[in-house]
């Protein structure tokens, strides 16, 4: 007579099956993670950091000629500020409009690509660490002490323009940069917002005015 199969065999096979680990899911974050492709859309004028940047963006210094030292002269960048980026051979040149640049550390609102006002979030979530803050390097027209603004200052006429034939004014020019924002409905996402990036001269012919 053949022996009956043991009833413990199914239990033994159950313990021999490979176990599948169950990973705990992290709680959903209220802010979206910073995806890798977004880094390609970030402007040099935007920095995500836990502390305010110590100096201007490198690209800004290169465009301004801060690293073009005269031949044979020792480099002395310790005293070079944002307003002193012109090469030594061009010290006699004057800008049509005076501009001042610096990091904006307390931006709260901005206008997006659709012309709507959005809230600029103060913190950006970072994996495995404390959140980052958003800093914007903006360039604006330099204010003048005079009430109406002097030549080259914001709100004043452009330097070197013949006032007999032209009406000129120095105005801030804006560009779009990527930033983490929230709209009026509370929807959080990366949007294009406008920030001041230059001070330009606008002209209006006096002969064409009424």
Curated annotation (Swiss-Prot):
Pfam families: NGF. Residues 25-80 form a propeptide. Glycans are attached at residue 76. GO terms for biological process: adult locomotory behavior; ameloblast differentiation; cell surface receptor protein tyrosine kinase signaling pathway; epidermis development; ganglion mother cell fate determination; innervation; long-term memory; mechanoreceptor differentiation. Target-derived survival factor for peripheral sensory sympathetic neurons. May promote ameloblast differentiation and subsequent reduction in proliferation of ameloblasts. Disulfide bonds join 97-170, 141-199, 158-201. Changing residue 206 to Q: In GLC1O; uncertain significance. It comes from Homo sapiens (Human). It is found in: Secreted. Belongs to the NGF-beta family. Its main location: secreted. This is Neurotrophin-4. One of its GO terms (cellular component) is synaptic vesicle. InterPro entries: Cystine-knot_cytokine, Nerve_growth_factor-like, Nerve_growth_factor-rel, Nerve_growth_factor_CS, Neurotrophin-4. SUPFAM superfamilies: Cystine-knot cytokines.
């Amino acid at each position: 007579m053949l022996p009956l199969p043991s009833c413990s065999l199914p239990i033994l096979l159950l313990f021999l099956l490979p176990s599948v680990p169950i990973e705990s899911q992290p709680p959903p974050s209220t802010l979206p993670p910073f995806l890798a492709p977004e880094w390609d859309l970030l402007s040099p004028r935007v920095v995500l950091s836990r502390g305010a940047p110590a100096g201007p963006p490198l690209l800004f210094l290169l465009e301004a000629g801060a690293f073009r030292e005269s031949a044979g002269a020792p480099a002395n960048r310790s005293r070079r500020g944002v307003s002193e980026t012109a090469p030594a051979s061009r010290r006699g040149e004057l800008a049509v409009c005076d501009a001042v640049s610096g990091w904006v550390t307390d931006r709260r609102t901005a206008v997006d690509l659709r012309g709507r006002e959005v809230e600029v979030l103060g913190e950006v979530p970072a994996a495995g660490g404390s959140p980052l803050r958003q800093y914007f390097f903006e360039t604006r027209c330099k204010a003048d002490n005079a009430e109406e603004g002097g030549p080259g200052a914001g709100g004043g006429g452009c330097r070197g323009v013949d006032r007999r034939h032209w009406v000129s004014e120095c105005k801030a020019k804006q560009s779009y940069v990527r930033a983490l924002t929230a709209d009026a409905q509370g929807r959080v996402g990366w949007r294009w917002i406008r920030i001041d990036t230059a001070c330009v001269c606008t002209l209006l012919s006096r002969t064409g005015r009424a």
